[in-house]
Each structure stands twice: as C-alpha cells, then as structure tokens.
Amino acid sequence: MMKMKINVDKSLIKAVKTGKVIVGANRTIDAAANGSAKMVVLASNCPEDIKKKIQATDIPVLEYEGTSVELGPVCGKPFTIAAMAILDVGESDILAATA
C-alpha cells in the first residue's frame, strides 16, 4: 500500500478553519481519553508526561515536526500549542497523515 504524502501544515490550517479542534494539553488529554478526538497532534517538544497519557489511548497521534512555537502560528493562534485534538476534520485530509 502506498502512503499518501500530504502537506501537514495546509491540512492543519484547513482542519482549524473548516472543522473543530481544541488546543491545550488538559483538554486534549480529556478528548483523547473520552474518545471524542479523531486525532491528536503533538508538537515535537511536547512534554513526555503529556505524550504518554495521550499515547495510552487508541486515538491516532501525529507527531508534528515543528515545536509548539511553530505549531501555534500554523493553526492561526498567537500562542504556543504543544497538544491539540481534532474533533472534526472538516474539509481537511489530515487523517491521512497517520494512515
């Protein structure tokens, strides 16, 4: 099976604009634990304790190559984002990033 190559930044922007996402470690952990998240995106510098809590769930995890300082602006936010949950992808193809 061939893995589809997508532009992660563009896909994240589209998910933020057309879907439903939540940001913040605690809210992301909760969404992963209760199954409402379709996918979790973790910045490369996300703290290990947060990564472990999220990876203990069955939710697909995308490890973003950039840091939290880079992930925030990609998502159109004026702050850092270490962890975010995608509840509804909208018109984005972001789920293909973990396929």
Curated annotation (Swiss-Prot):
Annotated signal peptide: none
Record bears the keyword Ribosomal protein: yes
GO cellular component: cytosolic large ribosomal subunit
Single GO MF descriptor: structural constituent of ribosome
An annotated GO BP: translation
InterPro entries assigned: Ribosomal_eL30, Ribosomal_eL30-like, Ribosomal_eL30-like_sf, Ribosomal_eL30_CS, Ribosomal_eL8/eL30/eS12/Gad45
PROSITE patterns: RIBOSOMAL_L30E_2
Keywords: Ribonucleoprotein, Ribosomal protein
Family to which the UniProt record says this protein belongs: Belongs to the eukaryotic ribosomal protein eL30 family.
PANTHER family recorded: RIBOSOMAL PROTEIN L30
Protein name (Swiss-Prot/TrEMBL): Large ribosomal subunit protein eL30
Species name: Methanosarcina acetivorans (strain ATCC 35395 / DSM 2834 / JCM 12185 / C2A)
Lineage: Archaea, Methanobacteriati, Methanobacteriota, Stenosarchaea group, Methanomicrobia
Gene name as annotated: rpl30e
